[in-house]
Amino acid sequence: EKYLDILESEGVKATFFVIGQQINGEEQTIKREISQGHEIGVHTYCHEADRIYCNCDTYYKDVIKVKNILKKQFDYDAGLVRFPWGSANTYISSYRDNIIQRFKNIGLEYADWNVSAEDSVGNPTQTSIMQNIRKDYVRYDEPVILMHDSGANKMTLSVLNNIILELKEKGYGFDVLSKRSKCCHFYEN
């Protein structure tokens, strides 16, 4: 909720990729995200590489499970998916084109990022998160910043407002990913 408070106070829209196993208990947060005009995308149901990425059908079913939960519980039709570890990850190399096409067939576009806060790796600090974002965002007209809002990523919350203010000062705008002129992809088929 604190993330949403900051986004609301700064007039910023964001895209949240949800993990299905974490939806239970976060229903009010997801409802608030939707009501405030944020976008909800599918990340995965369980976020365990060996389970979800063992083959194309297993991963497809994992994503569809979350898409169906969002539709049933929130009447929300998710149109984006973010592959855990990105679309160029080695787990899906044998079926990457197939899964991307299957997602497209049901109206799911995939999204990656071009700037990472690296806030889910090791023991991030406020300084390291800011440095990771600063070193890359200037390279893009439309930076897509990957940040995490769950788990042990409390440092991200502590710098979110500073990141927004700095980017606004540099002339950057904010919106949901589906409104970008072009999706950010690591892999193009």
Annotate each PLM feature:
Residues G20, S87, S150-G151:
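Residue-level signal for short, function-critical loop segments
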Residues E1-D77, F83, E166, G173, ...:
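Active-site beta->alpha N-cap acidic-glycine motif
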Residues L4-T15, K72, R139-N189:
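Terminal accessory/targeting
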Residues E48-F74, S87-E142, M155-S158:
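Alpha-helical scaffold elements lining the catalytic groove of polysaccharide deacetylases
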Residues V42-T44, L80-P84, A111-S116, V144-H148:
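Short beta-strands and strand-loop turn motifs
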